[in-house]
Amino acid sequence: MMETLSQRLSVCQDKILEHYETDSTCLSDHIQYWKLIRLECAVFYKAREMGIKTLNHQVVPTQAISKAKAMQAIELQLMLETLNTTEYSTETWTLQETSIELYTTVPQGCFKKHGVTVEVQFDGDKQNTMHYTNWTHIYILEDSICTVVKGLVNYKGIYYVHQGVETYYVTFREEAKKYGKKNIWEVHVGGQVIVCPESVFSSTELSTAEIATQLHAYNTTETHTKACSVGTTETQKTNHKRLRGGTELPYNPTKRVRLSAVDSVDRGVYSTSDCTNKDRCGSCSTTTPIVHLKGDANTLKCLRYRLGKYKALYQDASSTWRWTCTNDKKQIAIVTLTYTTEYQRDKFLTTVKIPNTVTVSKGYMSI
C-alpha cells in the first residue's frame, strides 16, 4: 500500500511541477491544478491514516492539515469551474490570480485583478503609513452568475458597490485605532490626497448623499471650473478631473483636496510597496512569500547556481547581499527567493536539499 501511495504522490507532484513550468494563463489549466492539489492532500491524508510519517522523503502533514488544505482546494476548484462557465472564462488568468492567497485576502471569497496601491498616513506622521490595495476588477460569483465591480476609495475606506449596496473591505477609522493615536489620517491615491481631519465628521456615520461624489482618476481636460472641498469653495481655470454627474474638479498631483470618494481604478499597479509601519502585514493583500537563505557568501553563490535546475519551484532569486547597518562582525550573506504561492515555497523547501551551514528564514514581502 505504501508503494502505491508513493507512486501516486510522485505522479501527482510531477504534474504539479509541470503546471509551474508551463505558467499557463488558461482557466481550465488552473482547474486541473487545484484537482492535483486536492489529490495530493488525499494521498497525504491516507498515508497519515496508515501511520506513515515520511513518504518519498517528504514529511507527511497531519490529517488536520491535509483536510484543511483539501477543503481549500475543493473550494477553489468549484469556484473556478463556475467562473469557467461565464463570459470571463476567456480572459487571461495567471496562477497568482487564482491562488488561495489572493482568493482569501480582502475582499474575501472572490477573485481580484489589477491592484492599485492606496497609501494612508496616520496622525500626520510620514513615518506612520500603511499601504492597502484597491482592485480594479473584483469578480463576484453568485448562483453561477459572475458580476465584475471596481473598487473605490474615499476617506472612510476602500469599498465596492454591488446591487446598490456599498461593501467596505478596509475601514480607515478602524485602521486608525490600530496604527494611530489621534484618530486622523489622510489618503494618498491616484496622485490625489484625501485629507480627513476628525472635525469633518462626528462619531456617527455620514449620510450616503454626503459621500456620493466620486472622482475619475486620470481623466483630465481644461475648462473653467469650481474647486470642490469640504467646507470651502473657490473658482479657478486649470487642468481638472471630471466628477460623475457633470461636476468638475481641478486636478493637480501635488494639490491637497478634500474629496468624498476617489475612483482609483485606472492605474495598473499589481503589488503594493513596503509600509513603514512594522505592524502592516495583515492589510497588504499582495504580499509575496519569500525565503531568506543566510550563510557564507561562497556557499550561497554555489547554492544559487545549483538552484537553476529547480527553477519551477521558485519565482525569482536575488544576488548575494548583506545588511549594512548591523553590529554583526561575521557579515552574514543573504540570498532571497520569491515564490508565486505558499504551496510553491513549501514544495521548494521539501524538495531542495539546503546545506546545514545555511539558515532558512520564511517570510513575506511586498514587491
UniProtKB/Swiss-Prot annotation:
GO annotation (BP), single: DNA-templated transcription
Keyword Transcription regulation set for record: yes
HAMAP family: PPV_E2
Subunit structure: Binds DNA as homodimer. Interacts with protein E1; this interaction greatly increases E1 DNA-binding activity. Interacts with protein L1; this interaction enhances E2-dependent replication and transcription activation. Interacts with protein L2; this interaction inhibits E2 transcriptional activity but not DNA replication function E2. Interacts with protein E7; this interaction inhibits E7 oncogenic activity. Interacts with host TAF1; this interaction modulates E2-dependent transcriptional regulation. Interacts with host BRD4; this interaction mediates E2 transcriptional activation function.
Post-translational modification comment from the UniProt entry: Phosphorylated.
Cellular component aspect of the GO annotation: host cell nucleus
Keywords, in A-Z order: Activator, DNA replication, DNA-binding, Early protein, Host nucleus, Isopeptide bond, Phosphoprotein, Repressor, Transcription, Transcription regulation, Ubl conjugation
Known role: Plays a role in the initiation of viral DNA replication. A dimer of E2 interacts with a dimer of E1 in order to improve specificity of E1 DNA binding activity. Once the complex recognizes and binds DNA at specific sites, the E2 dimer is removed from DNA. E2 also regulates viral transcription through binding to the E2RE response element (5'-ACCNNNNNNGGT-3') present in multiple copies in the regulatory regions of the viral genome. Activates or represses transcription depending on E2RE's position with regards to proximal promoter elements including the TATA-box.
Subcellular location: Host nucleus
Record-linked SUPFAM superfamilies: E2 regulatory, transactivation domain, Viral DNA-binding domain
Residue ranges, annotated region (DNA-binding domain): 287-367
Crosslinked positions (Glycyl lysine isopeptide (Lys-Gly) (interchain with G-Cter in SUMO)): 294
GO molecular function: DNA binding; DNA-binding transcription factor activity; nucleotide binding
Keyword check for ATP-binding: no
Protein name: Regulatory protein E2
Source species taxonomy: Viruses, Monodnaviria, Shotokuvirae, Cossaviricota, Papovaviricetes
Family: Belongs to the papillomaviridae E2 protein family.
Spans annotated as Transactivation domain: 1-201
Disulfide bridge partners, by residue number: none
